């Protein structure tokens, strides 16, 4: 049963499939025709090239050369070859060309006896040799050329190619300029104002620079010019090469010298003896107590007893140092005096420099300088205040000895030297003035000092006797003693070992003569004022002076 709507809908699909099949069929037919038209391709072989060369050499028909017909059998060709070989053999033929004729006969026979090569020869007879339109023609010519001929041919080809490339570059630039000129003309006609004058000037310069290739642009001329310029520049090139080689040698020598110097420095550093550090004196370890306000010694003891204990400890320490220090010779003493003149009072680090020159410790040098000063300033008839003090102390009853705490004073070589610097700077000025003054002046000063030392104990004895009878004077003196003791006690209790060390370091850092010295020292010691530092310093100086007076 036919439905009207569906039949009309299917009909166009059938038509499309028929059209598609009709368009594909001609393509298949065209491909088959092309495949059938293609002939088998055969390349030229070495046998073909030898055959072509033989044909050109003989310049005769091979069949005519043997005396046979073209359709002759191989047996007939063999018989003809034997007959001709007997006549053309060099042993029987005395002709000059006998060898070449016999060689050609053998080559012709080799071609005709083989059916395949004979068939190729027949094709040559029909079609002839390859002409100039075939590549094998040129190949056969090139095969016969020598090396020189090949080089010449290659050079000619390169020359022609180079000249053609030069012309192509020139024409290309000319074409670009022509197109650019036309574009500019169009822009001018349209009235566009975007044309830049600089671009126009550059294009005109390029047009002027364009030059047609000349005969000297040929490759042989270029090579000749390059060769001449190379010969001219050859001396300069040789000179530059020599300079470069000399610089290279210098750099190599410098590198070797640097390497040797480094090795020597390393060996010297290895050979250097390790400096033995001097053993630092062992100080008693300070252990802070939980109760910092606990008294470390009996405040009822006098300052003289504390000084005696301090002197005993310092004497024991000095004895050990004296054992280690070498003895002083006359040369050492003269060197000491010269160094003291060289480094006068007020010089920063004076005693360190003097000790460095003498090769001794600072304490050893300062003690010896003090001894020299005492020996110069004192006379045999003088009585020292320290001797009177010691006599007075011996007459007093002995009290309980108390140990001096470590936080009062810290003895070190550097710190002792620094404080002794402060003491001896004034003394050195006296020593230098005493050495420069005349002898009568010394006698006067010695007598005056003697008188002072004699008057002082008398005044003290008188004062003591008056105080025994005068109650007000006794009270005043007791008040003064109490105040002095309270000050010393406050100074002793308030100063810790770390603060004492900081004070000693600050005294070394800011020597005598520095501006705002005590302000800077007070800044270095925490929680201490300028007055505290000065009072502490005075106390330490008094202790050291008393110790030295007792020793002397």
UniProtKB/Swiss-Prot annotation:
CDD domains: DnaJ, SANT
Signal peptide: 1-43
Tissue: Widely expressed.
Domain of life: Eukaryota
Subcellular location(s) of the protein: Endoplasmic reticulum membrane; Nucleus membrane; Microsome membrane
Keyword Lipid metabolism among record annotations: no
UniProtKB keywords: Chaperone, DNA-binding, Endoplasmic reticulum, Membrane, Microsome, Nucleus, Phosphoprotein, Repeat, Signal, Transmembrane, Transmembrane helix
Record field: transmembrane: 150-170
UniProt-listed PROSITE patterns: DNAJ_1, DNAJ_2, SANT
GO cellular component, one term: endoplasmic reticulum
Cytoplasmic side: 171-552
Biased composition range(s): Basic and acidic residues: 453-470, 480-492
Any single biological process term in GO: protein folding
Molecular function terms from GO: DNA binding; protein-folding chaperone binding; ribosome binding
Disordered: region residues: 370-495
SMART domains xrefs: DnaJ, SANT
Protein name: DnaJ homolog subfamily C member 1
